[in-house]
């Protein structure tokens, strides 16, 4: 009997180590090695950033409330951070993966991110946040599934398909950095990739020898298609020839379900659609991601083309590509599409209660921030991009770490809540000092000449209005105060504004940035610091034990000594191992 007890104790402990949780929230673990490989997505050999040798990287697939551990080993020749746009990192900005909250991972070092997907579902991605590296890869999809007890507001699809799309240059990120550092714009991209591959040869303008994406499907089946634009600066129109896209979700919120023939996906955005394979199989069908709001004749090469292949298809796709239904020469017509996106107020989200049960439209606004972007300008002889006349310079010590160790003068809490036209553009480490549990509105005013995407870490905000012109207080009467969708990345058209509402219930330091990589690199960002003055450990987590130190705290950083075969263990895993040892010792004592 004692031997049997010992055996079951061993099995139980073994299961604990390998992630089978009998109590609490489960976890999933990933080991990511980021390194350079040579690839030719547009027919030209170039250096790209792979994750575990893959471009794009592996999918992170988890479920609401799961704990996610990602051990990142940096095999690049420069510092690295990974960030997780849209993952809210509740109480835990230490894991956000941007310079304001994390010290970079040096070459040949590793760092383990450890975060919980608290009360979230939906479609997201991960990507590098430093040194323009996203322009060379290092990205992949991040999927958060519903728990079994929370129903989805549509029939379970027959399968899932992920499309990672984005504009692409045949120069790597270091060459593109040099162009921006020299004071020049990047110019037109060399193409668009779909899942890391170039265009199908749909006409003679496409060179021979380019590998394209082919998606195999079965007739009559319905698939959930997740689309992520991880590109540099180009808004893309996504469409599948002769197939309707039924919009169901964006960045963690189920939407009112609407059919589209094509859909604009802006830089940094993620969407889910249901697509039914209801066409005849006389031929394959084109999958297209093409540049928007540009001269399409000049930008013809900036088009990604893949193939949708029915299992009973009788021939290849041929003929011209399907065109977008929206007139790109009239941006106000295109704006009607995002205006039509509404929250499904009767659907459950991450919890069983309806998404619309939080009545944001009935809460008084405590503060308004108008964040204005302009075309890049020269500051101290260098090309820079600004918000409210400030081009952000990251402090040498991450801000929350500086707070924790009482480092003075690292940053300033004086970011203006509206443009200061009387002041010249300047460089600064100025951030927003926001009030915990406040309810703010942020107006993104885009006075640049290009469409932009704005993102706020740590939060989902309600997109209540967008329009052309200059925002003013009297526009509040046009807000959608009932079923606005909540998301983390929103488009702002040139010469236009977008208004969002945010409930400040997540303590930490959170990045506010433009997702267009060229503008972000040039300084178009800031941070929002939200501190609970009565902090007692319940609203913000302590720094992790593996926190890295840099800047004024560099002397606190210990050297890493590890072999490539050694996997980093998280605190949770160490606790499980300790528990296993205790169980084994106890059982062994009884056995003896």
Curated annotation (Swiss-Prot):
Gene3D superfamilies: Cupredoxins - blue copper proteins. Residues 565-592 form a propeptide. The keyword rRNA processing does not apply. A lipid is attached at residue 564 (GPI-anchor amidated serine). Its main location: membrane. The keyword NADP does not apply. Its cofactor is Cu cation. This is Monocopper oxidase-like protein SKS2. Keywords: Cell membrane, Copper, Glycoprotein, GPI-anchor, Lipoprotein, Membrane, Metal-binding, Signal. It comes from the Eukaryota.
């Amino acid at each position: 009997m004692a031997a049997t007890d010992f055996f079951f104790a061993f099995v139980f402990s073994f299961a604990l180590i390998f992630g089978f949780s009998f109590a609490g929230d489960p976890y999933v673990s990933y080991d990511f090695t980021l390194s350079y490989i040579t690839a030719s997505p547009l027919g030209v050999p170039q250096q790209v950033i792979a994750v575990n040798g893959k471009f794009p990287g592996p999918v992170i697939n988890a479920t609401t409330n799961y704990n996610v551990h990602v051990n990142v080993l940096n095999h690049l020749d420069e510092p690295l951070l990974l960030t997780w746009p849209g993952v809210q990192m509740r109480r835990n900005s230490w894991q956000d993966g941007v310079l304001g909250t994390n010290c970079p991972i040096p070459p040949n070092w590793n760092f383990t991110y450890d975060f919980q997907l608290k009360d979230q579902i939906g479609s997201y991605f991960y990507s590098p946040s430093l040194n323009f590296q996203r322009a060379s890869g290092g990205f992949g999809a991040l999927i958060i599934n519903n728990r079994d007890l929370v129903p989805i507001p549509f029939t379970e699809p027959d399968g899932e398909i992920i499309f990672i799309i984005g504009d692409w240059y045949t120069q790597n990120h270091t060459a593109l950095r040099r162009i921006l550092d020299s004071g020049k714009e990047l110019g037109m991209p060399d193409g668009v990739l779909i899942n890391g591959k170039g265009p199908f040869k749909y006409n003679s303008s496409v060179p021979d020898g380019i590998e394209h994406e082919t998606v195999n499907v079965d007739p009559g089946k319905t698939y959930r298609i997740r689309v992520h634009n991880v590109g540099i600066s180009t808004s893309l129109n996504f469409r599948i020839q002769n197939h309707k896209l039924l919009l169901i979700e964006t960045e963690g919120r189920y939407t009112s379900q609407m059919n589209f023939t094509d859909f604009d996906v802006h830089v940094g955005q993620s969407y889910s659609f249901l697509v039914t394979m209801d066409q005849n199989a006389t031929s394959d069908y084109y999958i297209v991601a093409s540049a928007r709001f540009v001269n399409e004749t000049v930008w013809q090469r900036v088009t990604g083309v893949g193939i949708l292949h029915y299992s009973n298809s009788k021939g290849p796709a041929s003929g011209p590509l399907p065109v977008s239904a929206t007139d790109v020469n009239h941006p106000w017509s295109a704006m009607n599409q995002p205006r039509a996106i509404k929250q499904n107020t009767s659907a459950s989200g991450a919890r069983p209660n309806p998404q619309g049960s939080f009545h944001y439209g009935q809460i008084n606004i405590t503060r308004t921030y108008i964040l204005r972007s302009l075309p890049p300008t020269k500051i101290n002889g260098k090309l820079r991009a600004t918000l409210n006349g400030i081009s952000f310079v990251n402090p040498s010590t991450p801000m929350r770490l500086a707070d924790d160790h009482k480092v003075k003068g690292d940053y300033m809490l004086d970011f203006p809540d509206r443009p200061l036209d009387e002041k010249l553009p300047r460089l600064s480490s100025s951030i927003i000092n926001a009030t915990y549990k406040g309810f703010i509105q942020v107006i993104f005013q885009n006075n640049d000449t290009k469409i932009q995407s704005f993102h706020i870490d740590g939060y989902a905000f309600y997109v209540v209005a967008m329009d052309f012109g200059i925002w003013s207080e009297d526009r509040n009467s046009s807000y959608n105060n009932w079923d606005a969708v909540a998301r983390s990345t929103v488009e702002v058209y040139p010469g236009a504004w977008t208004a969002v509402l945010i409930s400040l219930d997540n303590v930490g330091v959170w990045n506010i940035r433009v997702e267009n990589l060229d503008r972000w690199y040039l300084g178009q960002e800031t941070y929002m610091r939200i501190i609970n003055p009565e902090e007692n450990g319940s609203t913000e987590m302590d720094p992790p034990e593996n926190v890295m130190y840099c800047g004024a705290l560099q002397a606190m950083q210990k050297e890493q000594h590890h072999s490539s075969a050694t996997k980093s263990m998280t605190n949770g895993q160490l606790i499980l191992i300790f528990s296993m040892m205790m169980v084994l010792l106890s059982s062994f004592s009884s056995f003896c």
